[in-house]
Amino acid sequence: DTPSATYKKELLFKLMQAFADKNADYFVADPEVVEKALAEAPTDLDHYTPESLVAFTAAKKALEGVGAETTRAEAKELISSLKAAQEALVYTESYAKEVAEKEAAEKLAKSKVISIDAGRKYFSLDQLKRIVDKASELGYSDLHLLVGNDGMRFVLDDMTLEANGKTYASDDVKAALLEGTKAYYDDPNGQALTQAEMDELIAYATSKGIGLIPAVNSPGHMDAILVAMQKLGIEHPQATFDTVSKTTMDLTNEEAVNFTKALIGKYMDYFKGKSKIFNYGTDEYANDATNAQGWYYLKWYELYGKFADYANSLAAMAREKGLQPMAFNDGIYYNGDTSYGTFDKDIIVSYWTGGWNGYDVASSKLLSELGHQILNTNDAWYYVLGRD
């Protein structure tokens, strides 16, 4: 009732639009709205299954038929039908795999990971929770937790293992692993996390938006497991070169290899469905028995191919259990040489070292060109080994 007020067409048009929308049964469909809905529909339909395209094609055709006699209400219903059919589209199996791999690669590329070596040194559940708290606060994405690295500091409720045509009783395996861990380092703060504690840690990390990447290292960094195998009756599981290794398994000892695969498989079974990635190590082969020349020794003795087969078998095992396989970089195409063996391209390479004097590793560029995803964990920048 104020004729002196300034006329604003935007306000009038908005009111006209609202009235038309409110009385959609009496107004003709808005062609711009229809065109927008059609433009948002996918056009490359080769990625979808024929079955799921039936409803989508019919809904799109119906919307394309909107004309001067179609009301807004009818058009709105047709648009809703098209959107529902679009949401119900199903990728073909091959394209779904391609999308999943792309998403996993993007997630890995954006990962911000804190790595805790809870194999060498015991970390309590409370300590690990506090680390998770800080990781969440700072915006980290994952906790990489080495539970088997020199020591073995995570024990499942049931450690029964089937290998070498025999059954290794749960209590015997637990006792042997505990003895091996104490032989490596008898930590006064504790020895190993229980399954209940790991369950709680994973649930807690999930609640804080932190994923968990478990690691059980082999065939190197196996000090505790090597002692355990001997206690369980497996003779001479250690690799022997200049001296007998305290850390590394002999890849020609089938009894030791079978036991180790059964043990790692046990942990993979536990972590499947709880973690996306499983790191099985494979770094620093027999460095203590070769003056850090273990990879050269494997090549000299024509055993490098056996190492590649071992690494690939663990990758296949992880994949079968729904886990992405991860391994450290130094043993993979050592010295950039691809002539001694081929590694599974599904192995995510945790690139922890660029090498040192006489320890010559493949470049990250080569590994990427050979099809591997790379997680940058360069120890020269990030690695701190606590001495106390």
Residue ranges and their predicted role:
Residues 1-102:
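Beta-rich interaction/scaffold domains
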Residues 101-119:
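N-terminal small/glycine-rich loop or linker at the start of catalytic domains
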Residues 106-110, 150-207, 222-258, 286-302:
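Aromatic- and acidic-residue-enriched carbohydrate-binding clefts of CAZyme catalytic domains
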Residues 112-116, 143-145, 212-216, 278-280, ...:
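Hydrophobic faces of well-ordered beta-strands that scaffold small-molecule active sites
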Residues 121-135, 360-363:
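Short, acidic/polar
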Residues 127-151, 271:
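Catalytic domains of carbohydrate-active enzymes, especially glycoside hydrolases
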Residues 138-140, 197-219, 245-279:
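An active-site-proximal structural segment forming one wall of the substrate-binding cleft
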Residues 250-348, 352-372:
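Active-site neighborhood of glycoside hydrolase catalytic domains
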